[in-house]
Amino acid sequence: MDIEKIYKEHGAFLEGHFLLSSGNHSQFYLQSAKILEFPWIAGELANELFNVIKNAGIEFDSVCSPALGGILAGYELAKSAHKRFIFTERVDKKMTLRRGFSVSKGEKFIVCEDIITTGGSALESAKIIESLGGEVVAFAALANRGFCAVQNLGNERKESCKLPFNKPLFTLGNFEFDIYEPENCPLCKTGSVAIKPGSRGN
């Protein structure tokens, strides 16, 4: 499956000057919502991702995603696997588990995102699950921004990845493009202003 082709065909691979949820800047942005608005495509991607996870021998009971971007990807993965789905969300900038969701002691989870950049939000969700007695057995996403090592793709881990070393990450593909700290952004130096299309703070 050519995940980059799918993103480009559906207008989900954006070019411009973007302020990422991490606070850094990039010339490119992956807007997964443009793909996930088509349920049949979301289902196909989730089926493919579940097969990757299953073929790796990973067994799990439930899927958890950080809101907002990860919800549809995680829900579809849980649907493909016939597993329970819950999500975490930010309240006053702190990731929390609400809405009556619970975690059983020893319950095995996959934390699923639409896109993994550094993995910060996924890690926050994982810490909540583990604090409640659950076990995170793996991370998953439709695509990886190239910073974290993906078990099924064999790419190298970079220093900015926040995911734990001892938990595998599974995705359908890598998108690798430059990310800049605001003070070193070449786009800013041309007078361009970064726009924020994504998650935190919106």
UniProtKB/Swiss-Prot annotation:
Its cofactor is Mg(2+). It holds the Pfam family Pribosyltran. It catalyses: orotidine 5'-phosphate + diphosphate = orotate + 5-phospho-alpha-D-ribose 1-diphosphate. Pathway: Pyrimidine metabolism; UMP biosynthesis via de novo pathway; UMP from orotate: step 1/2. The keyword Hydrolase does not apply. GO terms for biological process: 'de novo' UMP biosynthetic process; pyrimidine nucleobase biosynthetic process. It is an enzyme of class 2 (transferase). 5-phospho-alpha-D-ribose 1-diphosphate binds at K93, E113, D114, I115, I116, T117, T118, G119, G120, S121. GO terms for molecular function: magnesium ion binding; orotate phosphoribosyltransferase activity. Its EC number is 2.4.2.10. InterPro entries: OPRT, Orotate_PRibTrfase_bac, PRibTrfase_dom, PRTase-like. Keywords: Glycosyltransferase, Magnesium, Pyrimidine biosynthesis, Transferase. Orotate binds at T117, R145. HAMAP family: PyrE. NCBIfam families: pyrE_Therm. Belongs to the purine/pyrimidine phosphoribosyltransferase family. PyrE subfamily. PANTHER family: OROTATE PHOSPHORIBOSYLTRANSFERASE, URIDINE 5'-MONOPHOSPHATE SYNTHASE. Catalyzes the transfer of a ribosyl phosphate group from 5-phosphoribose 1-diphosphate to orotate, leading to the formation of orotidine monophosphate (OMP). Homodimer. This is Orotate phosphoribosyltransferase. It comes from Campylobacter hominis (strain ATCC BAA-381 / DSM 21671 / CCUG 45161 / LMG 19568 / NCTC 13146 / CH001A).
